[in-house]
Amino acid sequence: MKDVTIIGGGPSGLYASFYAGLRDMSVRLIDVQSELGGKMRIYPEKIIWDIGGIAPKPCHEILKDTIKQGLYFKPEVHLNERVVDIRKKAERHFEVETEAGEIYTSKAVIIAIGAGIINPKQLDVKGVERYQLTNLHYVVQSYRRFKDKDVLISGGGNTALDWAHDIAKIAKSVTVVYRKEDVSGHEAMKTLVTDLNVKLCPKTRIKYLVGNDDETHISEVVLEHVESGDRHTVKFDDVIISHGFDRCNTLLSETSSKLDMHDDCRVKGFGNTTTSIPGIYACGDIVYHDAKSHLIASAFSDGANAANLAKTYIQPDANAEGYVSSHHEVFKEANKTIVNKHLY
């Protein structure tokens, strides 16, 4: 039996893992995705400005450090496992069950599932799956691949406009198609992309994808006006889909441990990351409490808070908070290495 099972490997879950390790707890970390990082993996190239003391840098750089920190105390990690139930058997005895039927036991549970299981909405066009490993994209991993390319973006929200704005600086051309009369993203961003000569095509959708000779890459796209039905075919090197996300939060609605909810999709926190069930804590975007800010920075704070509460639940005579890291014995040898690196 582990001290704590953390469900969710995004920034809050990773920091909870680190801080629980710092508090000398054994940790199990479970995530439904094939990689740790949560929603941060959706926008790896976006520049993050709002983490205190961290200079603005691409999200993938922050994520790399966050994962490294989260794994510092060597938690037991399970990827590609979907949690379907949390059962409280007794005080300091929880069972976490996965879709595959695995049952993991721990003394406390931290829920850090963000907005739930998030997957980009797929383009509903025949044969689309054959291009998903080549030049059809739902996530932009690197802007560099679009250098000097003709790029089509489908979607009119903020993410689509952000990608159009950034890619237009290096691409040969960028075209944005969207079904409505106007984009739904910020008006200021619409002005910016227009200034960069991004072509905006309202009331237009992707009707067909035309492949190359061996059907491995998209070579042309048939676009259709949603009202008139007029169609025209355009050559593109890459196609990016930004149609929002499908979200699944069935864990909270179907679990045996019925938590008080703030709304249909967030756990009610009682002043912090405490939930209505002793021994279960929630951190990050999945929890609502009065001091909540939906920032990566506050996800870290939530993670530490949840770990501290789990510690005192498991061991009531433990200190409510851990020692500051600069004075913590566990980092003594690691600190010597870091100091020597900077001195010499």
From Swiss-Prot:
Cofactor note: Binds 1 FAD per subunit.
Catalytic activity: 2 reduced [2Fe-2S]-[ferredoxin] + NADP(+) + H(+) = 2 oxidized [2Fe-2S]-[ferredoxin] + NADPH
Broad class of enzyme this protein falls into: oxidoreductase
Full protein name: Ferredoxin--NADP reductase
Needed cofactors: FAD
Organism: Staphylococcus aureus (strain NCTC 8325 / PS 47)
A Pfam family hit: Pyr_redox_2
Binding residue positions for FAD: 12, 31, 39, 43, 83, 118, 285, 326
GO molecular function terms listed in the Swiss-Prot or TrEMBL record: ferredoxin-NADP+ reductase activity; flavin adenine dinucleotide binding; NADP binding; thioredoxin-disulfide reductase (NADPH) activity
UniProt xrefs under PANTHER family: THIOREDOXIN REDUCTASE 1-RELATED-RELATED
Description of how the protein assembles with itself and partners: Homodimer.
Biological process per Gene Ontology, one example term: cell redox homeostasis
Record EC number: 1.18.1.2
UniProt cross-references to Gene3D superfamilies, sorted A to Z: FAD/NAD(P)-binding domain
InterPro entries, per the entry: FAD/NAD-bd_sf, FAD/NAD-binding_dom, Fd--NADP_Rdtase_type_2, Ferredoxin-NADP_redctase_2
SUPFAM superfamilies in the record: FAD/NAD(P)-binding domain
Swiss-Prot/TrEMBL keywords: FAD, Flavoprotein, NADP, Oxidoreductase
Similarity remark: Belongs to the ferredoxin--NADP reductase type 2 family.
